[in-house]
Amino acid sequence: MKKILHTILFLLPLMAIAQTNFYVYKTDGTVETYAVSDVEKISFTAPEGPEEPVVTSKILTFEDSDAKFSKYTLDYCGVDVEKWSDLIPAADEQAYGASALIYDMVNSSAEYHWSDENNTGLSHTFPYNWGGYSFSGGGMVISNMTTTDEAMLQDTDIYNHQLSILNNSGANGSSNFAIVYNDSQVNPEVKNTLSFADGNAHTIKSMYVCIPAITLYCMINGNDFSQAYDDDDFLKLVATGTKADGRESVVEILLAEGDKYSTWAIDWTKWDLSSLGEVVSVSFHMEEAQIDDYGYAQYYKTPLYFAFDDVEVQ
């Protein structure tokens, strides 16, 4: 701890042999006199200054035990949300359009949304896309669906598992995490965004990310639109932070490169986001090498999803 010396002491001994005093000149303008024999009585102990501010971190975990937000209702489906797991679709409703929780707000003014109130302050609302609010247009959905059975990566029914990851848990052994669907259009206007509900700028230090099962399946096997990954392929996740004055900062992470499955970010991988600086929001998009050009727009071929968990905020 730093100590600030409020009184600077100057000790000036008189040089003449006959002089036996020390004079202490204090910063308040006074002078104190001490005999040489009493010099040990002079105290140089500085008073303690103010403590440096302690920088603390808070973590968005999506765990029910860490839920501090107020109860609210998703009006379009009548679901009361008191804890994070209330935002998780049923395990048998992962297919496109199957869950009223993440699909029934199409052509509606209501939307799936959540906020880490009274903790990190991070919040998310489904973006408006394709005429409404729906996970098929992008969004961040809470999930707890995990498997360690790699047979899923050969299951042609993979589209019924779009909220699953090939792990035995969330990051750091947790139960819940978020799955994000990235609109496949290249340079889309629609963004998957985390915002601070208080409107102030904060530093997002890091988060954990991994590639969900549905994207892994298509990277390994291809589908009707994409090819299996080869040496020239890559999968990248990009974060764009927006500062209070509107300036942007960017950081990215390479989730996969080439066809070496063992090197891909299948396990939870810590991503350092501190270089974004203090931001009021951060948006995410994904990029890959495989692109279809339809003239009016370009689209990535592979269904692009990512999972994230344990977001650390200062």
What are these regions, as identified by a protein language model?
Residues 199-206, 278-279:
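Extended extracellular/luminal ectodomain segments enriched in beta-structured repeat modules
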Residues 53-189, 199:
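N-terminal targeting leaders for non-cytosolic proteins
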Residues 41-58, 314:
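Low-complexity, Pro/Thr/Ser/Gly/Ala-rich linker/spacer regions in secreted
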Residues 1-23:
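Bacterial Sec-dependent N-terminal signal peptides
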Residues 26-48, 73-82:
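N-terminal targeting signals for Sec/Tat export/insertion, comprising classic cleavable signal peptides
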Residues 218-237:
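Short coil-to-beta strand junction motifs in C2/discoidin
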Residues 60, 64, 232-314:
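Terminal, low-complexity interaction segments
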Residues 20-35, 62-66:
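Short N-terminal segments immediately surrounding and downstream of signal-peptide cleavage
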